[in-house]
Design a protein with these regions (language model features):
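A solvent-exposed interaction/effector surface
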Residues: 1-156
Length: 156
């Protein structure tokens, strides 16, 4: 786990709310964003992100945005939001393993930050910038136990 300074990164994504039981609908948003970008000849980063604003559960809804970072800011529309990950210090780590086990890595990162005296950027229950970036292409590595996912939380 580490702290690293990052510059602003433009994004294009679709924001939704869903419980874990509805997560298939969330996962379906990635291909939709890719189609939207391709129709505009915009090259996305190879790794999709999931930006979490509110963490939910099987019964309570997550507020999540699924998308891709892009080289320069793009105009959004009614469906795809143009945004950015803000400039700042981020607490970062990499989860290696099945996505179903990623909550443990999130908890470890939050505990580590607290132990270092680092306050993560939140406004009540809403995270300012907390996201997962999926580093492994499932078409290349089909075993989810080998997948790598970067977790990043903006420092307050």
């Amino acid at each position: 786990m580490r702290v690293e300074k990052r510059g602003a990164q433009p994004t294009a994504g679709i924001r939704t709310t869903a419980t874990l039981a509805e997560w298939g609908e969330v996962n379906a948003l990635g291909p939709e964003v890719l189609e939207w970008l391709a129709a505009r000849d915009i090259q996305p980063a190879p790794a999709p992100y999931y930006r979490y604003r509110v963490i939910g559960s099987f019964e309570e809804k997550f507020d999540v945005e699924v998308g891709y970072t892009v080289a320069t800011a793009v105009p959004g529309d009614d469906r795809v939001l143009a945004g950015e990950f803000p400039t700042g210090d981020y607490v970062v780590t990499t989860h290696v393993g099945h996505p179903d086990q990623i909550a443990t890595t999130h908890l470890a990162l939050v505990d580590w930050a607290a132990g270092q005296g680092i306050t993560l950027a939140k406004d009540g229950e809403v995270w300012v910038a907390m996201y997962e970036s999926y580093q492994t292409d499932p078409a290349v590595e089909p075993d989810p136990n080998s997948w790598r996912t970067e977790l990043a939380y903006l420092v307050a």
